[in-house]
A protein has these predicted regions:
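A late C-terminal transmembrane helix in Major Facilitator Superfamily
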Residues: 77-112
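Helix-to-loop junctions at the C-terminal end of transmembrane segments
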Residues: 10-22, 109-110
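Multi-pass alpha-helical transporter architecture, strongest
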Residues: 43-44, 120-148
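A membrane-interface helix-boundary motif in multi-pass transporters
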Residues: 107-126
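Intracellular juxtamembrane helix-capping segments at the cytosolic ends
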Residues: 65-78
Length: 148
């Protein structure tokens, strides 16, 4: 089920992007980041198995929703002859960061002494995504307004 939900949310993100103007693409980072962070906070605070499952799955959906925005933003900003290289660099940096998230979560869990505390790392990552997406959204809207 988690894989299918992730696949579906990535597809939904792509469909939404197809209906948006290019300068609106960061909206998915803002909304997806906020909803993922809220889902993870709810997960951390919940103790009922059904709610835990629901919040984990909802975090997965909102995380996946953001995926399609990455190549869309890169295509909008990168020079036409460098889109593939730009995406490769961004994807590589993202993979390196993602590789350290479980380690960082484990360090937080060990220092605080609870499993749920480790999920705060995911909350912070999504707050950063929300803020960066918001700044990118403002920047892209300003650029679109100037060129219009």
């Amino acid at each position: 089920i988690p894989f299918l939900l992730s696949l579906g949310s990535k597809f939904l993100g792509g469909v939404l992007l197809d209906k948006m103007r290019p300068e609106q693409a960061p909206v998915l980072f803002v909304v997806g980041g906020a909803m993922t962070a809220l889902s993870v906070v709810a997960l951390m605070l919940s103790h009922q198995p059904a709610w835990l499952a629901l919040f984990m799955l909802s975090a997965n959906v909102f995380w996946g929703l953001q995926g399609a925005a990455i190549p869309a933003v890169i295509q909008h900003h990168a020079a036409r002859e460098a889109v593939g290289s730009a995406y490769g660099i961004i994807n590589g940096i993202g993979n390196i960061c993602a590789a350290f998230i479980p380690l960082l979560m484990g360090m937080v869990m060990r220092s605080v002494g609870s499993v749920s505390s480790g999920f705060s790392v995911l909350v912070v990552s999504q707050v950063v995504t929300l803020l960066a997406g918001g700044m990118l959204l403002l920047r892209m809207r300003r650029a679109a307004a100037i060129s219009a």
